[in-house]
Amino acid sequence: MRILGDFLMHYGVPGMKWGVRRKTETLFVSGSSKTQDPLSGYYRRKLPRKIRKELKYAIRGGQRIIVGDAPGIDRQTQDYLRKKHYSNVIVYGPGKQVRYSADKKWKTRPIDAPEYKEGSKRWLAKKDIAMTNDATRGLAIVLDEGAKATRHNVSRLQRQHKNVKVYELSKYGKRKDRWW
């Protein structure tokens, strides 16, 4: 995978812009459950501008967006999509029912994992694995160094040869926007 200006050359898709995609694509939004800005210490009330821009591209393209039901980035993404009156959204949640869906008209997909203890990391990871399998590309938002689940989602998408764009805000003051 190489980046050439704004264009991505990845697994036989030369010159395709990140924001210009087909309607058949599914964007998996993954992020930290903590929304505290490591630089200022304040809690973010809305998504960073770059993330909103990426979501606007997906909305314009009519892509399906899949997002989790956890607090933090998942909830902020859902609130943003509801504010934009976007309907092509599927909310995934662990267990027998989804914990939070910003719009009752959106489809929901509960992922039950009775073989694992409820609330355990493996129980939660089952939902992330299903989302990774259903996505054609990913957008990951890392706001703290401890976002292990988000990093696992990025590596799962990479192993399946799917494009992932990572927005990282580290506690060392460096805002990064990069491909992994």
Language-model regions, residue ranges each:
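Charge-dense, intrinsically disordered terminal/linker segments
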Residues: M1-E25, R178
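Acidic/glycine-enriched connector segments
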Residues: G31-R178
